Protein backbone atom coordinates (compact mmCIF):
# COMPACT_ATOMS: atom_id res chain seq x y z
CA UNK A 1 0.00 0.00 0.00
CA UNK A 2 2.42 2.60 -1.33
CA UNK A 3 1.89 6.23 -2.25
CA UNK A 4 3.10 6.79 -5.80
CA UNK A 5 3.44 10.14 -7.56
CA UNK A 6 3.02 10.85 -11.27
CA UNK A 7 4.29 13.89 -13.14
CA UNK A 8 1.95 14.20 -16.13
CA UNK A 9 4.18 16.20 -18.46
CA UNK A 10 3.77 14.73 -21.95
CA UNK A 11 7.49 15.14 -22.69
CA UNK A 12 8.10 12.45 -20.08
CA UNK A 13 5.16 10.95 -18.18
CA UNK A 14 6.82 9.70 -15.00
CA UNK A 15 5.83 7.71 -11.91
CA UNK A 16 7.96 7.28 -8.79
CA UNK A 17 7.67 5.78 -5.32
CA UNK A 18 10.00 8.48 -4.01
CA UNK A 19 13.13 6.37 -4.32
CA UNK A 20 13.02 4.91 -7.82
CA UNK A 21 11.66 6.15 -11.13
CA UNK A 22 9.28 3.31 -11.96
CA UNK A 23 8.47 4.38 -15.51
CA UNK A 24 8.97 7.28 -17.88
CA UNK A 25 7.66 7.65 -21.42
CA UNK A 26 6.45 10.36 -23.84
CA UNK A 27 2.82 11.19 -24.54
CA UNK A 28 2.62 9.43 -27.90
CA UNK A 29 -0.12 7.20 -29.31
CA UNK A 30 0.01 4.97 -32.40
CA UNK A 31 -3.10 3.50 -34.02
CA UNK A 32 -1.98 0.16 -35.47
CA UNK A 33 -4.09 -2.20 -37.54
CA UNK A 34 -4.46 -4.46 -34.51
CA UNK A 35 -5.04 -1.78 -31.88
CA UNK A 36 -3.77 1.28 -30.04
CA UNK A 37 -0.34 1.52 -28.42
CA UNK A 38 1.16 4.38 -26.44
CA UNK A 39 4.43 5.64 -25.03
CA UNK A 40 7.85 4.42 -26.17
CA UNK A 41 6.45 1.98 -28.70
CA UNK A 42 4.54 4.79 -30.42
CA UNK A 43 7.57 7.12 -30.24
CA UNK A 44 9.79 4.47 -31.83
CA UNK A 45 7.77 4.53 -35.07
CA UNK A 46 6.60 8.16 -35.12
CA UNK A 47 8.63 9.04 -38.23
CA UNK A 48 7.76 5.77 -39.95
CA UNK A 49 4.01 6.17 -39.48
CA UNK A 50 3.34 9.88 -38.85
CA UNK A 51 -0.29 9.74 -40.00
CA UNK A 52 -1.06 7.03 -37.46
CA UNK A 53 0.65 8.87 -34.59
CA UNK A 54 -0.73 11.44 -32.14
CA UNK A 55 1.14 13.51 -29.56
CA UNK A 56 -1.21 16.42 -28.85
CA UNK A 57 -3.72 14.73 -26.56
CA UNK A 58 -2.38 15.40 -23.06
CA UNK A 59 -2.24 19.16 -23.68
CA UNK A 60 -5.59 19.16 -25.49
CA UNK A 61 -7.57 16.82 -23.25
CA UNK A 62 -11.16 16.84 -24.51
CA UNK A 63 -14.02 14.48 -25.29
CA UNK A 64 -14.54 15.71 -28.87
CA UNK A 65 -13.73 13.26 -31.65
CA UNK A 66 -10.25 13.64 -33.11
CA UNK A 67 -10.16 15.36 -36.50
CA UNK A 68 -7.99 12.79 -38.30
CA UNK A 69 -10.12 10.28 -40.22
CA UNK A 70 -8.14 7.35 -38.81
CA UNK A 71 -8.84 8.52 -35.25
CA UNK A 72 -12.43 9.76 -35.62
CA UNK A 73 -13.75 6.96 -33.41
CA UNK A 74 -11.44 8.16 -30.62
CA UNK A 75 -11.07 11.28 -28.46
CA UNK A 76 -8.07 12.78 -26.70
CA UNK A 77 -9.62 11.46 -23.49
CA UNK A 78 -9.54 7.92 -24.92
CA UNK A 79 -5.82 8.22 -25.66
CA UNK A 80 -5.06 9.63 -22.19
CA UNK A 81 -7.13 6.86 -20.63
CA UNK A 82 -5.28 4.14 -22.51
CA UNK A 83 -1.84 5.50 -21.65
CA UNK A 84 -2.68 6.17 -18.00
CA UNK A 85 -4.17 2.69 -17.65
CA UNK A 86 -1.08 1.10 -19.21
CA UNK A 87 1.27 3.00 -16.90
CA UNK A 88 -0.73 2.21 -13.78
CA UNK A 89 -0.97 -1.49 -14.59
CA UNK A 90 2.79 -1.57 -15.15
CA UNK A 91 3.81 -0.11 -11.78
CA UNK A 92 0.98 -0.37 -9.24
CA UNK A 93 0.30 -3.07 -6.68
CA UNK A 94 -3.02 -3.68 -4.90
CA UNK A 95 -3.69 -0.91 -2.40
CA UNK A 96 -1.34 1.65 -3.97
CA UNK A 97 -2.51 5.28 -4.18
CA UNK A 98 -1.56 7.97 -6.67
CA UNK A 99 -0.76 11.67 -6.30
CA UNK A 100 -0.71 13.77 -9.47
CA UNK A 101 1.67 16.61 -10.36
CA UNK A 102 -0.08 18.41 -13.21
CA UNK A 103 1.55 20.82 -15.70
CA UNK A 104 0.50 24.41 -16.26
CA UNK A 105 -0.97 23.74 -19.70
CA UNK A 106 -3.87 21.79 -18.15
CA UNK A 107 -6.86 24.00 -17.27
CA UNK A 108 -9.73 23.33 -14.86
CA UNK A 109 -11.77 21.53 -17.52
CA UNK A 110 -8.81 19.30 -18.42
CA UNK A 111 -8.20 18.46 -14.77
CA UNK A 112 -11.83 17.58 -14.14
CA UNK A 113 -11.79 15.25 -17.12
CA UNK A 114 -8.50 13.73 -15.94
CA UNK A 115 -9.95 12.93 -12.52
CA UNK A 116 -12.97 11.37 -14.20
CA UNK A 117 -10.71 9.16 -16.32
CA UNK A 118 -8.78 8.05 -13.23
CA UNK A 119 -12.04 7.22 -11.47
CA UNK A 120 -13.24 5.14 -14.43
CA UNK A 121 -9.93 3.24 -14.32
CA UNK A 122 -10.26 2.65 -10.54
CA UNK A 123 -7.04 4.54 -9.90
CA UNK A 124 -7.22 5.95 -6.35
CA UNK A 125 -6.06 9.55 -6.83
CA UNK A 126 -5.50 11.09 -3.40
CA UNK A 127 -3.94 14.45 -4.32
CA UNK A 128 -3.38 16.78 -7.26
CA UNK A 129 -0.74 19.52 -7.09
CA UNK A 130 0.66 22.10 -9.51
CA UNK A 131 3.85 20.59 -10.94
CA UNK A 132 6.03 23.67 -10.36
CA UNK A 133 5.02 23.77 -6.70
CA UNK A 134 5.78 20.07 -6.32
CA UNK A 135 9.25 20.61 -7.81
CA UNK A 136 10.12 23.50 -5.47
CA UNK A 137 11.32 22.00 -2.21
CA UNK A 138 13.35 24.89 -0.75
CA UNK A 139 13.24 28.63 -0.26
CA UNK A 140 15.42 30.87 -2.43
CA UNK A 141 16.40 33.60 0.02
CA UNK A 142 16.75 37.14 -1.40
CA UNK A 143 15.31 36.01 -4.76
CA UNK A 144 12.10 35.26 -6.64
CA UNK A 145 11.93 31.71 -8.04
CA UNK A 146 10.53 30.83 -11.44
CA UNK A 147 10.30 27.16 -12.37
CA UNK A 148 11.17 26.35 -16.01
CA UNK A 149 10.07 23.11 -17.67
CA UNK A 150 9.45 21.92 -21.22
CA UNK A 151 6.58 19.81 -22.52
CA UNK A 152 6.35 18.36 -26.02
CA UNK A 153 4.83 21.55 -27.43
CA UNK A 154 5.55 24.41 -25.01
CA UNK A 155 7.75 25.84 -22.29
CA UNK A 156 6.09 26.42 -18.93
CA UNK A 157 7.25 29.27 -16.70
CA UNK A 158 5.81 29.44 -13.18
CA UNK A 159 6.52 32.28 -10.77
CA UNK A 160 6.30 31.21 -7.12
CA UNK A 161 5.53 33.03 -3.89
CA UNK A 162 7.61 32.25 -0.79
CA UNK A 163 5.34 33.16 2.11
CA UNK A 164 6.39 30.34 4.42
CA UNK A 165 5.97 27.71 1.69
CA UNK A 166 6.16 27.20 -2.07
CA UNK A 167 3.06 28.76 -3.58
CA UNK A 168 1.90 29.32 -7.16
CA UNK A 169 1.64 33.00 -8.13
CA UNK A 170 1.27 33.10 -11.91
CA UNK A 171 2.51 31.34 -15.02
CA UNK A 172 3.20 31.76 -18.72
CA UNK A 173 2.88 29.08 -21.39
CA UNK A 174 5.29 29.70 -24.27
CA UNK A 175 3.87 28.00 -27.36
CA UNK A 176 6.09 26.65 -30.15
CA UNK A 177 8.91 26.34 -27.62
CA UNK A 178 8.60 22.70 -26.64
CA UNK A 179 10.81 19.65 -27.00
CA UNK A 180 9.44 18.78 -30.42
CA UNK A 181 10.02 22.31 -31.71
CA UNK A 182 13.66 22.11 -30.64
CA UNK A 183 14.07 18.55 -31.93
CA UNK A 184 12.75 19.65 -35.31
CA UNK A 185 15.26 22.50 -35.50
CA UNK A 186 18.18 20.28 -34.53
CA UNK A 187 17.21 17.37 -36.77
CA UNK A 188 17.11 19.70 -39.77
CA UNK A 189 20.51 21.10 -38.80
CA UNK A 190 21.96 17.59 -38.43
CA UNK A 191 20.52 16.56 -41.79
CA UNK A 192 22.06 19.61 -43.48
CA UNK A 193 25.44 18.72 -41.95
CA UNK A 194 25.21 15.19 -43.36
CA UNK A 195 24.38 16.59 -46.80
CA UNK A 196 27.30 19.03 -46.70
CA UNK A 197 29.86 16.64 -45.23
CA UNK A 198 28.93 13.25 -46.70
CA UNK A 199 26.40 13.97 -49.47
CA UNK A 200 23.81 11.90 -47.60
CA UNK A 201 20.33 13.19 -46.70
CA UNK A 202 18.92 11.33 -43.67
CA UNK A 203 15.54 13.06 -44.04
CA UNK A 204 15.07 11.53 -47.48
CA UNK A 205 13.59 8.34 -46.03
CA UNK A 206 11.38 7.78 -42.99
CA UNK A 207 13.69 5.01 -41.78
CA UNK A 208 16.76 7.24 -41.47
CA UNK A 209 14.68 10.10 -40.07
CA UNK A 210 13.57 7.73 -37.30
CA UNK A 211 17.23 6.88 -36.68
CA UNK A 212 17.96 10.56 -36.08
CA UNK A 213 15.02 10.87 -33.71
CA UNK A 214 16.14 7.80 -31.76
CA UNK A 215 19.63 9.25 -31.21
CA UNK A 216 18.86 12.93 -30.65
CA UNK A 217 19.01 12.79 -26.83
CA UNK A 218 22.44 11.14 -26.92
CA UNK A 219 23.77 13.86 -29.23
CA UNK A 220 22.30 16.61 -27.06
CA UNK A 221 24.07 15.15 -24.03
CA UNK A 222 27.38 15.27 -25.91
CA UNK A 223 26.69 18.85 -27.06
CA UNK A 224 26.30 19.91 -23.43
CA UNK A 225 29.73 18.59 -22.42
CA UNK A 226 32.02 18.71 -25.48
CA UNK A 227 32.99 21.26 -28.12
CA UNK A 228 32.00 19.06 -31.07
CA UNK A 229 29.46 16.30 -31.59
CA UNK A 230 30.46 13.33 -33.78
CA UNK A 231 27.37 11.93 -35.49
CA UNK A 232 27.12 8.62 -37.29
CA UNK A 233 24.25 6.54 -38.66
CA UNK A 234 24.39 3.34 -40.67
CA UNK A 235 21.98 2.80 -43.54
CA UNK A 236 21.98 -0.23 -45.84
CA UNK A 237 25.39 -1.28 -44.65
CA UNK A 238 27.05 2.09 -45.20
CA UNK A 239 28.18 4.30 -42.29
CA UNK A 240 27.55 8.01 -42.78
CA UNK A 241 29.35 10.52 -40.57
CA UNK A 242 29.22 14.21 -39.73
CA UNK A 243 30.66 16.48 -37.07
CA UNK A 244 28.85 19.50 -35.65
CA UNK A 245 30.05 22.20 -33.30
CA UNK A 246 28.16 22.23 -30.02
CA UNK A 247 27.73 25.98 -30.42
CA UNK A 248 25.78 25.30 -33.62
CA UNK A 249 23.10 23.56 -31.54
CA UNK A 250 22.78 26.68 -29.39
CA UNK A 251 22.77 29.03 -32.38
CA UNK A 252 20.06 27.03 -34.15
CA UNK A 253 17.84 27.18 -31.06
CA UNK A 254 18.28 30.94 -30.57
CA UNK A 255 14.77 31.96 -31.83
CA UNK A 256 13.12 29.52 -29.40
CA UNK A 257 15.41 30.46 -26.53
CA UNK A 258 14.79 34.16 -27.15
CA UNK A 259 11.04 33.58 -26.97
CA UNK A 260 11.50 31.89 -23.61
CA UNK A 261 13.72 34.74 -22.40
CA UNK A 262 11.16 37.40 -23.40
CA UNK A 263 8.37 35.65 -21.51
CA UNK A 264 10.60 35.03 -18.52
CA UNK A 265 11.76 38.64 -18.22
CA UNK A 266 8.14 39.83 -18.22
CA UNK A 267 7.55 37.76 -15.05
CA UNK A 268 10.12 39.79 -13.10
CA UNK A 269 9.72 43.28 -11.71
CA UNK A 270 12.57 45.75 -11.54
CA UNK A 271 14.79 45.18 -8.52
CA UNK A 272 13.95 41.50 -8.15
CA UNK A 273 16.71 38.88 -8.26
CA UNK A 274 15.76 35.83 -10.35
CA UNK A 275 16.21 32.30 -9.06
CA UNK A 276 15.73 30.24 -12.21
CA UNK A 277 14.87 26.64 -11.31
CA UNK A 278 15.24 24.37 -14.36
CA UNK A 279 13.88 20.85 -14.60
CA UNK A 280 16.35 18.20 -15.71
CA UNK A 281 14.57 18.25 -19.08
CA UNK A 282 15.19 21.97 -19.53
CA UNK A 283 18.75 21.63 -18.25
CA UNK A 284 19.55 19.07 -20.97
CA UNK A 285 18.86 21.56 -23.75
CA UNK A 286 22.29 22.74 -24.98
CA UNK A 287 22.99 26.33 -23.96
CA UNK A 288 19.55 27.04 -22.47
CA UNK A 289 20.71 27.49 -18.88
CA UNK A 290 23.60 29.73 -19.98
CA UNK A 291 21.27 31.77 -22.21
CA UNK A 292 18.80 32.36 -19.37
CA UNK A 293 21.62 33.30 -17.00
CA UNK A 294 23.08 35.78 -19.50
CA UNK A 295 19.79 37.38 -20.62
CA UNK A 296 17.74 37.29 -17.42
CA UNK A 297 20.41 37.32 -14.73
CA UNK A 298 20.21 36.04 -11.18
CA UNK A 299 21.14 32.44 -10.39
CA UNK A 300 20.30 29.17 -12.13
CA UNK A 301 19.48 25.96 -10.24
CA UNK A 302 19.29 22.59 -12.01
CA UNK A 303 16.99 19.88 -10.67
CA UNK A 304 17.59 16.15 -10.81
CA UNK A 305 15.59 13.69 -12.91
CA UNK A 306 12.17 13.02 -11.42
CA UNK A 307 12.42 15.99 -9.04
CA UNK A 308 8.78 17.03 -9.50
CA UNK A 309 7.25 13.64 -8.71
CA UNK A 310 9.75 13.00 -5.90
CA UNK A 311 8.98 16.39 -4.40
CA UNK A 312 5.30 15.52 -4.42
CA UNK A 313 5.52 12.05 -2.90
CA UNK A 314 7.64 13.40 -0.02
CA UNK A 315 5.30 16.30 0.82
CA UNK A 316 1.89 15.13 -0.32
CA UNK A 317 -1.14 15.81 1.84
CA UNK A 318 -3.68 13.14 0.93
CA UNK A 319 -7.36 13.98 0.68
CA UNK A 320 -9.70 12.43 3.20
CA UNK A 321 -11.55 9.27 2.13
CA UNK A 322 -14.72 10.20 0.29
CA UNK A 323 -13.76 13.85 -0.23
CA UNK A 324 -13.23 15.43 -3.64
CA UNK A 325 -9.70 15.94 -4.95
CA UNK A 326 -8.96 19.55 -5.86
CA UNK A 327 -5.89 21.25 -7.28
CA UNK A 328 -3.43 22.36 -4.58
CA UNK A 329 -1.14 25.26 -5.41
CA UNK A 330 1.03 25.31 -2.31
CA UNK A 331 3.24 22.87 -0.40
CA UNK A 332 5.67 23.23 2.52
CA UNK A 333 9.40 23.17 1.88
CA UNK A 334 11.30 20.09 3.07
CA UNK A 335 14.87 21.06 2.14
CA UNK A 336 17.27 23.67 3.53
CA UNK A 337 17.01 27.17 2.04
CA UNK A 338 19.61 28.52 -0.35
CA UNK A 339 20.77 32.14 -0.36
CA UNK A 340 20.97 33.85 -3.76
CA UNK A 341 23.52 36.59 -4.47
CA UNK A 342 21.54 39.76 -5.14
CA UNK A 343 24.41 41.14 -7.23
CA UNK A 344 23.69 38.93 -10.23
CA UNK A 345 20.56 40.61 -11.52
CA UNK A 346 21.39 41.56 -15.13
CA UNK A 347 24.27 40.93 -17.47
CA UNK A 348 22.93 42.26 -20.77
CA UNK A 349 23.77 45.64 -22.31
CA UNK A 350 21.88 48.61 -20.90
CA UNK A 351 20.16 50.92 -23.43
CA UNK A 352 21.09 54.57 -23.71
CA UNK A 353 18.15 55.80 -25.85
CA UNK A 354 14.55 55.01 -26.68
CA UNK A 355 13.72 55.16 -30.39
CA UNK A 356 10.28 56.40 -31.50
CA UNK A 357 10.10 56.35 -35.26
CA UNK A 358 13.29 58.10 -36.36
CA UNK A 359 13.67 60.09 -33.14
CA UNK A 360 16.06 58.83 -30.42
CA UNK A 361 15.69 60.23 -26.90
CA UNK A 362 18.27 59.66 -24.11
CA UNK A 363 17.02 57.64 -21.14
CA UNK A 364 19.75 58.44 -18.61
CA UNK A 365 19.43 61.01 -15.83
CA UNK A 366 15.94 62.20 -14.92
CA UNK A 367 12.97 59.93 -15.57
CA UNK A 368 11.43 60.09 -19.04
CA UNK A 369 7.62 60.06 -18.96
CA UNK A 370 5.55 58.65 -21.85
CA UNK A 371 1.92 59.48 -22.51
CA UNK A 372 -0.54 61.69 -24.34
CA UNK A 373 -0.50 64.74 -22.06
CA UNK A 374 2.67 66.58 -21.12
CA UNK A 375 3.35 67.68 -17.57
CA UNK A 376 5.26 70.85 -16.78
CA UNK A 377 8.69 70.38 -15.25
CA UNK A 378 9.14 66.75 -16.35
CA UNK A 379 11.08 65.11 -19.18
CA UNK A 380 8.38 63.99 -21.55
CA UNK A 381 8.09 61.92 -24.69
CA UNK A 382 4.82 63.05 -26.23
CA UNK A 383 3.09 60.17 -28.02
CA UNK A 384 0.42 62.42 -29.49
CA UNK A 385 -2.98 63.63 -28.31
CA UNK A 386 -5.24 60.90 -29.71
CA UNK A 387 -3.44 57.56 -29.49
CA UNK A 388 -5.86 54.68 -28.78
CA UNK A 389 -5.03 52.71 -25.66
CA UNK A 390 -2.47 55.17 -24.30
CA UNK A 391 -3.02 56.94 -20.97
CA UNK A 392 -2.12 60.55 -20.24
CA UNK A 393 0.78 59.38 -18.05
CA UNK A 394 1.25 55.87 -19.33
CA UNK A 395 4.69 54.86 -18.06
CA UNK A 396 8.13 56.22 -17.35
CA UNK A 397 11.68 55.09 -18.07
CA UNK A 398 14.32 55.78 -15.43
CA UNK A 399 17.64 54.56 -14.08
CA UNK A 400 17.30 52.63 -10.82
CA UNK A 401 20.35 51.08 -9.12
CA UNK A 402 22.25 51.19 -12.38
CA UNK A 403 19.48 49.55 -14.39
CA UNK A 404 17.18 50.97 -17.05
CA UNK A 405 13.66 50.44 -15.70
CA UNK A 406 10.19 50.95 -17.17
CA UNK A 407 7.37 51.53 -14.68
CA UNK A 408 3.74 51.18 -15.78
CA UNK A 409 1.14 53.73 -14.59
CA UNK A 410 -1.64 52.90 -17.06
CA UNK A 411 -4.97 51.15 -17.30
CA UNK A 412 -4.19 49.59 -20.67
CA UNK A 413 -0.81 48.03 -19.95
CA UNK A 414 2.81 48.39 -20.98
CA UNK A 415 4.27 45.48 -22.95
CA UNK A 416 7.88 44.26 -23.08
CA UNK A 417 8.62 42.26 -26.24
CA UNK A 418 4.92 41.50 -26.57
CA UNK A 419 4.30 40.53 -22.93
CA UNK A 420 2.49 42.74 -20.42
CA UNK A 421 4.70 43.73 -17.50
CA UNK A 422 3.58 43.52 -13.89
CA UNK A 423 4.23 47.03 -12.58
CA UNK A 424 7.83 47.38 -13.72
CA UNK A 425 10.59 45.62 -15.65
CA UNK A 426 14.26 45.99 -16.48
CA UNK A 427 15.00 47.08 -20.06
CA UNK A 428 17.82 45.84 -22.27
CA UNK A 429 19.24 46.97 -25.59
CA UNK A 430 17.10 45.63 -28.43
CA UNK A 431 13.88 45.42 -26.41
CA UNK A 432 10.63 46.48 -28.03
CA UNK A 433 8.36 48.44 -25.70
CA UNK A 434 4.68 48.72 -26.60
CA UNK A 435 2.76 51.43 -24.82
CA UNK A 436 -0.96 50.62 -24.63
CA UNK A 437 -3.29 48.56 -26.83
CA UNK A 438 -3.06 48.84 -29.81
CA UNK A 439 -0.74 51.65 -28.72
CA UNK A 440 2.70 52.71 -29.90
CA UNK A 441 5.90 50.70 -30.27
CA UNK A 442 9.32 51.99 -29.24
CA UNK A 443 12.72 50.30 -29.37
CA UNK A 444 15.47 50.46 -26.77
CA UNK A 445 18.84 51.12 -28.40
CA UNK A 446 22.46 51.67 -27.43
CA UNK A 447 24.22 54.68 -28.93
CA UNK A 448 27.98 54.62 -28.62
CA UNK A 449 29.50 58.00 -27.87
CA UNK A 450 32.98 58.96 -28.99
CA UNK A 451 35.04 61.75 -27.51
CA UNK A 452 37.76 63.51 -29.47
CA UNK A 453 40.01 66.55 -29.02
Language-model features and meaning:
Residues 359-445, 450-452:
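Forkhead-associated
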Residues 75-141, 162:
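Active-site neighborhood for divalent-cation/phosphate handling
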Residues 1-25, 29, 138-169, 186, ...:
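Gly/Thr-rich phosphate-binding beta-strand-loop-beta motif of the actin/hexokinase/Hsp70
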Residues 160-245, 280:
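Phosphate-binding glycine-rich/basic clefts of nucleotide- and phosphate-handling proteins
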Amino acid sequence: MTLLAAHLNDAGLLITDGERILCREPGYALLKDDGLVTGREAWATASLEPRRTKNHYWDDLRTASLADARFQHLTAADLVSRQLETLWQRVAKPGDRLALAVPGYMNAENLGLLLGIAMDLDIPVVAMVDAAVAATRRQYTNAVPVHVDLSLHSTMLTRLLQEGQAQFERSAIVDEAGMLDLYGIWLRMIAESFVQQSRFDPLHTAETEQMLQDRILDWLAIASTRETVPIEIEYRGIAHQAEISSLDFVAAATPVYQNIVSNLRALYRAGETPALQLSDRAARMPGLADTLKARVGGAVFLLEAGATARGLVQRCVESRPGSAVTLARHLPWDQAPVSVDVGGREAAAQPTHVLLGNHAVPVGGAALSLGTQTSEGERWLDLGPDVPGVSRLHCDISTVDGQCVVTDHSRYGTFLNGHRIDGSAVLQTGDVLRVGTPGVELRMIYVETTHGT
